[in-house]
């Protein structure tokens, strides 16, 4: 059995996913129409106050929910729901509903919903793999907008530099295995994850004494430190910390336990 994690205590989701599931029946348009109804908002307010309502996970405060991306400018990235409600002089739930409507349901948030103690315990667990749970991004163009989760830039350097090297929760080989060989085995990718004859030449050259994430919640669009060269399918794509322009990556599909 395997589990996986990203080494952060904040999660990310669409803002509307915090609301009761019945609101989403019929799609986004139906959700937005319902949220404009004061009676529906009253029902939501009652529901989220119930013991056991778990859409909010372990969220203790509206200050633990901050805007990550607001495609239509409904709210400023980095501001918390508590901030927005105070500035608009309204109830926090009304602020949530108003932002969702103005952004047509596309607002994404960061949510402090996990414990750092749990993050550390899972990082040290031999059965836990590591992944970013996010898309490829860059600090320019359309993906350089807003304040997305720092895991998009820093997941792997953070595990190596912070949790393995600085905190000593696991060894360097253990940390690397979680994101390479062990992950490839779990996913059934037969020719990936190891430095061996017959394996695809996917290689990252880094300095173990300096590698670290630099992406933060307030300033997420930051590349990590300590990585000099990246090779994908035998082609150098990062050289001296700069992209070469090469795009040798390809889609990997699993068929059973053998990569086709």
Regions found by a protein language model. Give the residues of each.
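Active-site neighborhoods of metal-dependent hydrolases
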Residues: 1-168
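Divalent metal-coordination and catalytic microenvironments
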Residues: 4, 89, 133, 175, ...
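C-terminal cap of metal-dependent C-N hydrolases
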Residues: 37, 120-127, 132-133, 137, ...
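Alpha-helical structural signal
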Residues: 93-97, 180-183, 248
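Acidic, glycine-enriched loop/beta-strand segments at the rims
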Residues: 107-113, 119, 167-176, 184-221
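Feature captures the catalytic cores and cofactor-binding loops of soluble hydro-lyases/lyases
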Residues: 137, 145, 149, 157-169, ...
